[in-house]
């Protein structure tokens, strides 16, 4: 999240993370960076490398999407890098045969997470967040009276077989106050 401190209406001030239940977990990687590479042909996977020595690819699953590849259309360069916090992957195949993937929720504080703690109400699929959970890049608490910008990134680097990559699905953001 970001407060427009300089008042220019642009997201060019300091970004803050909203801490969640796994922020301080031993398995959480702070200062994580992953770089994605534009595929050179339609139907090809999106390759990635990270700053932990890892690499892999986002599989192209034509049965679920009809775009040429999963590299974002709004990115004009052949690579783009995301920086932030990486959570431990919790997904697993309960069948042992690759046919029944489970993605358990995190305790609280993450988008597209079905924790009862995060829900706006008992019947909603919406998640709620509090800017009182804002932290800086070093994990220190930050007091923000309000925010002007929201950026949402998937905090997990994992695949779930035929479901594909674990990714955040967000349909909108609104103020609950």
Model-identified regions with their sequence ranges:
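A Trp-anchored, charged/polar loop motif used as the substrate-binding/catalytic surface
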Residues: 121-141
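Short beta-strand-plus-loop segments that form exposed binding edges in beta-rich domains
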Residues: 152-159
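Extended interaction regions within the primary functional domain
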Residues: 19-23, 137, 167
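Aromatic, loop-rich ligand-recognition surfaces of beta-strand-rich domains
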Residues: 1-12, 160-177
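Internal, well-ordered interaction modules that form the hydrophobic cores of assembly/scaffold domains
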Residues: 2-7, 15, 21-24, 150
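Low-complexity, serine/threonine/proline-enriched polar segments
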Residues: 10-13, 21-122
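Generic detector of ordered, mature protein regions
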Residues: 28-31, 138, 160-165
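Extracellular Ig-like/FN3 beta-sandwich strand-entry sites
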Residues: 144-149
């Amino acid at each position: 999240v970001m407060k427009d401190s300089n008042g220019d209406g642009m997201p060019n001030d300091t970004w803050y993370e909203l801490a969640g239940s796994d922020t301080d977990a031993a398995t959480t990687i702070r200062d994580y960076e992953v770089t994605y590479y534009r595929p050179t042909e339609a139907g090809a996977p999106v390759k990635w490398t990270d700053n932990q020595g890892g690499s892999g690819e986002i599989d192209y699953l034509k049965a679920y999407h009809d775009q040429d590849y999963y590299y974002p259309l709004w990115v004009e360069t052949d690579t783009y890098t995301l920086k932030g916090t990486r959570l431990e992957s919790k997904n697993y195949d309960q069948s042992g045969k690759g046919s029944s993937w489970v993605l358990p929720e995190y305790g609280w504080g993450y988008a597209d997470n079905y924790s009862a703690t995060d829900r706006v109400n008992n019947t909603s699929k919406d998640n709620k967040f509090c800017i009182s959970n804002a932290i800086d890049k070093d994990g220190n608490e930050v007091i923000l009276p309000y925010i002007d910008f929201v950026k949402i990134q998937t905090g997990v680097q994992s695949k779930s077989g035929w479901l594909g990559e674990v990714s955040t699905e967000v349909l909108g953001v609104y103020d609950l106050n």
